[in-house]
Amino acid sequence: MKGAIRKNLLTERIDIVKPLGWYRDSPTLTDVDVKYLLLYFEENYGLTVEKKIIDAVAVIANENRYHPVCDFLNALQWDGTERIRFCLHRFLGSDTDDYTYEALKLFLLGAISRAFKPGCKFEVMLCLVGGQGAGKSSFFRLLAVNDDWFSDDLKKLDDENVYRKMQGHWIIEMSEMIATANAKSIEEIKSFLSRQKETYKIPYETHPADRKRQCVFGGSSNTLDFLPLDRTGNRRFVPVMVYPERAEVHILADEQASREYINQMWAEAMEIYRSGNFRLRFSPAMNDYLKAHQKDFMPEDTKAGQILDYLERYSGSMVC
């Protein structure tokens, strides 16, 4: 029993991490587990007060808390081979330029920071843009390392269960959400990305509590002009074009090999994180590049086009 009951800081639930003599198909504590534990304490210690036993289990779990993502990241050993710069090209055919490198590096460091420092300020969404079947969603899923740490179930931000759908996940994909959004919902997405915590009550607790964010959000779109014509700026959205025909290998061609590559990429990112030589935002020069680059992913401004067309054809000496 010693060391078997632990609180999972990612899911905020109690896990049983060792075999305890009965059949289990999930690490998370269930009602059946509680019944077995009550029976165990009654037979071995003569304890029959259910509430006190359940309270004791919660205290023991909290004293033995752990974070599976942090444990995974801390255990990584980098082999010294650079992968962050080449990963998106290898699996999705993206460019290997400084922008693509900085975009992925920023996203990785944001995810690492959210694991070790929940609620830290990070409002960037890496957006993979390209045709269907390129492997964009699979990339985010494998990037999460454990499929249980990934979710693509966040379809609507006005869903009353949106915060519960975030719970227990590290990488969350928001597929086509920006491309199908109107002006009002774009502002809602921006506000959503900027939050550092949520306050809500989970079903088995009595009081609401602040839940600091431990996740980051990735976007994917099959539509090229998915960004809105937004005069207030789209700095949160970092688009990277994918060209599957240029990829070295499809990410699912050998999933085990892809996972090993991605694990080493996380190890490389951890070296940067441990050094402390990073910021969770672009440099001013890269921000300028981003603003220009984002125009390639916006629909044409028809009014601006009409004005430019008029000016090109205008032969007078005064415009107004």
Predicted regions and their residues:
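N-terminal nucleic-acid engagement/recognition segments and initiation subdomains in replication
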Residues: 1-86, 98, 102
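Alpha-helical protein-protein interaction elements
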Residues: 14-15, 32, 37, 83, ...
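Feature primarily recognizes SF3-like P-loop helicase cores of small DNA viruses
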Residues: 42-67, 121, 148-152, 158-193, ...
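P-loop NTPase catalytic core of nucleic-acid-dependent motor ATPases
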Residues: 57-171
